[in-house]
Curated annotation (Swiss-Prot):
Molecular function terms, GO-annotated: ATP hydrolysis activity; magnesium ion binding; nucleotide binding; RNA binding
The family this protein is said to belong to: Belongs to the rotavirus NSP5 family.
Entry-linked HAMAP family: ROTA_NSP5
Pfam families, sorted: GBR_NSP5 (PF17580)
Chain segments annotated as coiled-coil in the UniProt record: none
Biological-process GO terms, alphabetical: viral genome replication
Subcellular location, record wording: Host cytoplasm
Description of how the protein assembles with itself and partners: Homodimer. Interacts with VP1. Interacts with VP2. Interacts with NSP2 and NSP6.
GO CC terms of this entry: host cell cytoplasm
Annotated protein name in UniProt: Non-structural protein 5
PTM comment, free text: O-glycosylated.
Sorted UniProt keywords: Glycoprotein, Host cytoplasm, Nucleotide-binding, RNA-binding
Length: 176
């Protein structure tokens, strides 16, 4: 059998030196930061950690040295210029539009309910009329069939045998 490769993982980290990194560029003790570095860590990791702190300190210096743009445009006051609306007017308009939307929704619901009631009343009338028509049709059918049956039975004595056979076959055909 071939040997299975083994991987050995270390349980303990070896702590090495403490590095001092200058964050703000001042040579004071307050601006110095101590970083623990592993002796067995990758070289790129230790380089990248110190490099990132140096970049951070340079970026911080550049930001503090830059003068900010006009602060009048970026800051807002309670009373705006005459051409622009104040925040109070904007909030009132927003509240009014919300209230208008709510009232519009309520009005639409009321209109829908009224239309449904009208549709329901017309549909009820249509249903009642269709029931009346069906009842009248069934009554007339019963009357015509009953009367026809009675006349056939009363006059069956006067019919000949072939006429009786054809009458029976016609009745059976209508029953199907």
């Amino acid at each position: 059998m071939s040997e299975v490769p083994r991987f050995e993982l270390r349980n303990k980290r070896k702590v090495g030196k403490k590095q001092k990194v200058d964050i703000f560029g001042d040579k004071d003790d307050e601006s110095m930061l101590q970083i623990d570095c592993e002796t067995d860590s990758l070289i790129s990791e230790s380089v990248s950690s110190t490099h990132s702190y140096e970049d951070y300190s340079k970026a911080y210096k550049e930001l503090t040295l830059e003068t900010p743009a006009d602060t009048n445009d970026s800051t807002s006051t309670i009373i705006d210029s005459a051409y622009e609306e104040s925040w109070y007017d904007k909030t009132i308009k927003d509240e009014q539009t919300k209230e208008n939307k709510k009232t519009d929704k309520k009005l639409k619901r009321i209109e829908n309910i009224k239309e449904n009631n009208q549709n329901d009343s017309t549909s009820m009338q249509i249903a009642q009329l269709s029931l009346r028509i069906q009842r009248i049709e069934s009554e007339t059918k019963l009357k015509t069939l009953d009367s026809a049956y009675n006349t056939i039975i009363t006059q069956a004595d006067n019919l000949t045998t072939p006429q009786k056979k054809s009458l029976i076959s016609a009745i059976l055909a209508t029953m199907r």
